[in-house]
Amino acid sequence: MYAVIVTGGKQHKVTEGEFLKVEKLDVATGEAIDFDRVLLVANGEDVKIGLPVVEGAKVTAEVVSHGRHDKVRIIKFRRRKHHMKRQGHRQWFTEIKITGIQA
């Protein structure tokens, strides 16, 4: 059984027991969270597609940890001017474990 959920402006295909890194959520570590925006639920041959969401479906997850991704380096360069600007960015994430899918 799997589902497609929306969180942080992105769509994720999830299965029960899977660990997933999503955009930072303001939930404490160890707490449970419900995702109500479920676009698709599939259980073998039984597939439910939402318009735009599946009514009554929800995915429950547990927050495992918070952290930051690896650094992404940005370089802005102007030709012939001896100008180079370097910048780095580390995006925050929340790691979750999918504990249940209900359709």
Curated annotation (Swiss-Prot):
An MF annotation (GO) of this entry: rRNA binding
Keywords, sorted A to Z: Ribonucleoprotein, Ribosomal protein, RNA-binding, rRNA-binding
SUPFAM superfamilies linked: L21p-like
Domain of life: Bacteria
Entry GO CC: cytoplasm; ribonucleoprotein complex; ribosome
Gene Ontology biological process terms from the UniProt entry: translation
Family: Belongs to the bacterial ribosomal protein bL21 family.
Subunit structure: Part of the 50S ribosomal subunit. Contacts protein L20.
Protein name per its UniProtKB record: Large ribosomal subunit protein bL21
Gene source species: Pseudomonas aeruginosa (strain ATCC 15692 / DSM 22644 / CIP 104116 / JCM 14847 / LMG 12228 / 1C / PRS 101 / PAO1)
